[in-house]
Amino acid sequence: MTWFTPDVIDAIIAVVKAIVVLLAVVVCGALLSFIERRLLGWWQDRYGPNRVGPFGMFQIAADMLKMFFKEDWTPPFADKVIFTLAPVVAMSALLIAFAVIPITPTWGVADLNIGLLFFFAMAGLSVYAVLFAGWSSNNKFALLGSLRASAQTVSYEVFMGLALMGIVVQVGSFNMRDIVEYQAQNLWFIIPQFFGFCTFFIAGVAVTHRHPFDQPEAEQELADGYHIEYAGMKWGMFFVGEYIGIILISALLVTLFFGGWHGPFDILPSLAFFWFALKTAFFIMLFILLRASIPRPRYDQVMDFSWKFCLPLTLINLLVTAAIVLLNTPAGSVQ
């Protein structure tokens, strides 16, 4: 009797895939900080980081060494357990959310029938990390930043979910692979669900606290917000987690609205990973371009925009989509 039964082999393959995806996402998140600084320098007609190594390519290594050797300081007035737990929860929730994203027809950590719901569960968990960080720091700026962040995230997650319900109504499934295959047989959802795409993208920028929705950590107002008391590797986990969030939202946009691993007009279907990576990189660049080009609105304007514009738009989009699907459904199949 051998231990290497088909079930054991499948489990080993699943673990290896999970480790590879985990390492790739963390490395890409770290590299993205350097890429962002170089792109911002290029777009703003100035030099980016160019001192460490040729063309500044080793800047990320220098930053990692500096962060690794910094004192891992915990304020004496902080709640030490929750203070330490907050960055771990923040980064873990984002990494676990990648489990349901199908990268190619054969690559993906988990093929869940409730893939979209799993993503929203992990997104909701990240709110607790922000609250933990702000409250446990025992700092008024950190607490105010965490309250801003939690209110903003909860507000935008409401219509982030509603923006995707039009897709669920059309496909009839929460499974990510089913959504990708549906787009391969029909139009990419960027066309029939254009308003859903716009609102989901806006919500994605807001829940990752990226510019112009970075009020929770606005340096001019809150002195870096809810991670003002963090240093060393704890701060680094929040920092890299922000870029991992950008990659996650970009990958979701590609999966849900741009055909996933399929190329336009099914060009070169054998290059599934290339198409997925290319489209994801485009949206990552768009995130960075927003930081370089759009001013930051006031916090009350951000909240008004969420509840008074985006929420009604997503509800109208969902109602219209449901009506069209119902009218196109044969009478005998309606239960």
UniProtKB/Swiss-Prot annotation:
It is an enzyme of class 7 (translocase). Keywords: Cell inner membrane, Cell membrane, Membrane, NAD, Quinone, Translocase, Transmembrane, Transmembrane helix, Ubiquinone. Its EC number is 7.1.1.-. GO terms for molecular function: NADH dehydrogenase activity; oxidoreductase activity, acting on NAD(P)H, quinone or similar compound as acceptor; quinone binding. PROSITE patterns: COMPLEX1_ND1_1, COMPLEX1_ND1_2. GO terms for cellular component: plasma membrane. It catalyses: a quinone + NADH + 5 H(+)(in) = a quinol + NAD(+) + 4 H(+)(out). The chain crosses the membrane at residues 12-32, 81-101, 114-134, 154-174, 187-207, 238-258, 270-290, 307-327. Belongs to the complex I subunit 1 family. NCBIfam families: PRK06076.1-1, PRK06076.1-2. NDH-1 is composed of 13 different subunits. Subunits NuoA, H, J, K, L, M, N constitute the membrane sector of the complex. This is NADH-quinone oxidoreductase subunit H. It comes from Pseudomonas savastanoi pv. phaseolicola (strain 1448A / Race 6) (Pseudomonas syringae pv. phaseolicola (strain 1448A / Race 6)). The lineage of its organism: Bacteria, Pseudomonadati, Pseudomonadota, Gammaproteobacteria, Pseudomonadales. The gene is nuoH.
